[in-house]
Design a protein with these regions (language model features):
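N-terminal/domain-start alpha-helical segments
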Residues: 1-87
Length: 87
């Protein structure tokens, strides 16, 4: 089974994404804070991260940079921002 980490601070959106992914057969960890995302990433084998850019305890971009220093994992940003930024 492949495991997806959803880091999204909007609780309802987080739950909806997790529900949809679980129904599609994925293992899912849903968190609403960056620090909890780091802890979950360290403690579990994560195959993909769906990551919000704006989080209550930091920016998703810094979380992504931290992840890339740990190991190579695909990251898809979830955001309503209107500017493209490459990291």
């Amino acid at each position: 089974m492949q495991y997806i980490l959803v880091v999204e601070d909007d609780y309802d959106l987080n739950q909806a994404i997790c529900y949809s992914l679980k129904k599609s057969g994925y293992g899912v960890y849903g968190v609403t804070f960056m620090e909890k995302g780091k802890q979950t990433f360290i403690e579990n084998q994560i195959d993909l991260i769906l990551l919000d850019v704006n989080l209550p305890d930091g920016e998703g971009f810094s979380f992504c940079q931290w992840v890339k220093k740990q190991r190579e994992v695909p990251v898809i940003y979830l955001t309503a921002r209107d500017m493209a930024v490459s990291y």
